[in-house]
Amino acid sequence: MAELQMLLEEEIPGGRRALFDSYTNLERVADYCENNYIQSPDKQRALEETKAYTTQSLASVAYLINTLANNVLQMLDIQASQLRRMESSINHISQTVDIHKEKVARREIGILTTNKNTSRTHKIIAPANLERPVRYIRKPIDYTILDDIGHGVKVSTQNMKMGGLPRTTPPTQKPPSPPMSGKGTLGRHSPYRTLEPVRPPVVPNDYVPSPTRNMAPSQQSPVRTASVNQRNRTYSSSGSSGGSHPSSRSSSRENSGSGSVGVPIAVPTPSPPSVFPGHPVQFYSMNRPASRHTPPTIGGSLPYRRPPSITSQTSLQNQMNGGPFYNQNPVSDTPPPPPPVEEPVFDESPPPPPPPEDYEEEEAAVVEYSDPYAEEDPPWAPRAYLEKVVAIYDYTKDKEDELSFQEGAIIYVIKKNDDGWYEGVMNGVTGLFPGNYVESIMHYSE
């Protein structure tokens, strides 16, 4: 405050007086220089002296103006700071007044209200009576509670009597049919066909139960034994007088010893034989086609073969009245072969029970059949093939590039496609067929 007062009373008025004095002094200097330049004989010297006065006068005036300007700016700064302090004081007074007004308003509002006493409590309150902990009781785990849930196949254990075996139904769907490619070529480069249901096998109308026969023991039997997974078949045929050949279907059940579980063996179906009138009913092995058949000699028999797992004991049982017989479907349209050789089948001592397995619902079975191509392949068989399979269901082709076959037909597989279809040769004809309608053939010899 004293500084501002000194500026206002002393320095700023002193600067103004100095400027007025400089003004009057400059007028006198100007008159002197003019007269000196006119009267002096040395014009050059007079001119130089005039220049020196002019420069000094300009410097003096500039200094005085600068001093006065600084004093004025300093005065303005001091006044601005004082104004800020005054503004702050006024704001403080205004806030104080507002606070006082709010207090008065709250007091007036409080007069119109009543006091309420609130008790403070904890957010979590412990229960007054503690619950007794429940004792843990262990319950056994039921591993079969989810057996009927989902799309899995539930296998039921069946007590199979000797000689009886339920027929397996054919698959309801076959693999996606391959497209119709070029002329006669087999390919899978076109879109697949839609899945079509396959009709199940039907028992023929001329089904005749087998008559009761006595089984005579023999040392040799022209049959092959092979084990399959839960499917046993014995193929036989009975002749009738008058040249008629009624087809019958039978199945026999055998329990093999250890080593016969889990070996998948396909079962071929023999072709219909030709039995002359008067010949007794007899068992016989599936004959070769007429094109490769040689008349057997009476009393002769094929060498007996059995798998190594049941070399000790073999049981061939045929049921009376219920003895299942399989229908003999022809493999080709060749003439019927000559009458077969009488080959009695005998019963040996029952085999030992199978060893205990982890899976109780799967049982090993022995299938007896005679493979017509066991010794050598027919002339129409390809030189190189992947495996030889036998049809386990009847199949009728839907397109020209497929094969039609009946149960027991022998097919030589030359290619396996990724979509489940096989390419094979049957009776000299090459075509496609579903892979789930056949099973592989495995031969065992001593």
Curated annotation (Swiss-Prot):
InterPro entries per UniProt: ABI, Abi2_SH3, Abl-interactor_HHR_dom, SH3-like_dom_sf, SH3_domain, T_SNARE_dom
Modifications the protein undergoes after translation, according to the UniProt entry: Phosphorylated by ABL1.
Transmembrane segments: none
Consequence of gene disruption: Knockout mice are born at the expected Mendelian rate. Mutant mice have grossly distorted lenses due to defective orientation and migration of secondary lens fibers associated with impaired anterior and posterior sutures formation. Mice exhibit neuroanatomical abnormalities characterized by defective dendritic spine morphology and misoriented cortical and hippocampal neurons, causing profound deficits in learning and memory.
The keyword Cytoplasm is annotated on this UniProt entry: yes
Location within or outside the cell: Cell projection, Lamellipodium; Cell projection, Filopodium; Cytoplasm, Cytoskeleton; Cell junction, Adherens junction
Assembly: Component of the WAVE complex composed of ABI2, CYFIP1 or CYFIP2, BRK1, NCKAP1 and WASF1/WAVE1. Within the complex, a heterodimer containing NCKAP1 and CYFIP1 interacts with a heterotrimer formed by WASF1/WAVE1, ABI2 and BRK1. CYFIP2 binds to activated RAC1 which causes the complex to dissociate, releasing activated WASF1. Interacts (via SH3 domain) with ABL1 and ABL2.
Free-text comment on this protein's domains from its UniProt entry: The SH3 domain is critical for binding to ABL1 and ABL2.
Record-stated family: Belongs to the ABI family.
Annotated protein name in UniProt: Abl interactor 2
Organism annotation: Mus musculus (Mouse)
